């Protein structure tokens, strides 16, 4: 890798763009793409990186890749285009109000859903325009069964029905016996929710809660 980038925290993803199957990874110095067959370095987008704690995995759709370093710095979208030399990454937008925390983002029907410092936010994937913004603070998000599950950094959990122009909280609770966060902002509730086999799993540090969320007969 040019520059010898160190690894960050984000997971690699796979996309087909600009005529090539690529592995896309958010490294210490930015988002990069490499040819999946040959390992050839193709492109880099550095604006969303403040390294080394680049945490959220990128999102790829068609020829576009969205990234945020998850440190409330901002998020950016690039379009990948084939060139005579390989592949270029051309910035479409960089915005600070878009989902930009370590809790990830969900791409659904052309909109990104996630959290920023203020709370849950919906933005148009194509242009970064904010559709709506809520309060409640940052958190991690999961999409399942037509709803967002939000695990706030403060420990609370919310079930949310979302759409481009709508936000409806259908319920919320705080799991009991919360662990002590002894190191302040360096030790928040950062774990993503998990839904499997009709159960919701919430973890915070060494504590795990499991809830039956199957519909009642």
Residue ranges and their predicted role:
Residues 75, 155-157, 163-164, 183-217:
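Blade-level signature of beta-propeller repeat domains, shared across WD40, Kelch, NHL, RCC1
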């Amino acid at each position: 890798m040019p520059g010898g980038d160190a690894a960050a925290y984000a997971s690699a993803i796979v996309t087909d763009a600009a005529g090539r199957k690529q592995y896309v990874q958010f490294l210490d110095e930015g988002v990069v793409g490499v040819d999946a067959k040959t390992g050839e370095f193709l492109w880099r987008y550095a604006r969303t990186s403040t390294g080394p704690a680049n945490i959220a995995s990128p999102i790829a759709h068609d020829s576009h890749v969205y990234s945020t370093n998850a440190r409330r710095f901002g998020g950016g979208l690039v379009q990948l285009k084939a060139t005579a030399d390989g592949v270029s990454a051309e910035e479409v937008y960089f915005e600070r109000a878009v989902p930009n925390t370590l809790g990830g983002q969900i791409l659904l029907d052309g909109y990104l859903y996630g959290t920023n410092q203020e709370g849950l936010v919906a933005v148009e994937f194509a242009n970064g325009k904010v559709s709506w913004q809520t309060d409640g603070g940052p958190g991690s998000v999961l999409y399942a069964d037509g709803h967002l599950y939000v695990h706030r950094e403060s420990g609370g959990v919310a079930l949310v029905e979302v759409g481009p122009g709508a936000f409806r909280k259908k319920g919320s609770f705080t799991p009991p016996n919360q662990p002590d966060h002894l190191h302040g902002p360096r030790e928040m509730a950062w774990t993503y929710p998990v839904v499997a086999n009709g159960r919701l799993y919430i973890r915070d540090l060494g504590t795990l809660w499991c809830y039956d969320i199957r519909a009642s007969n």
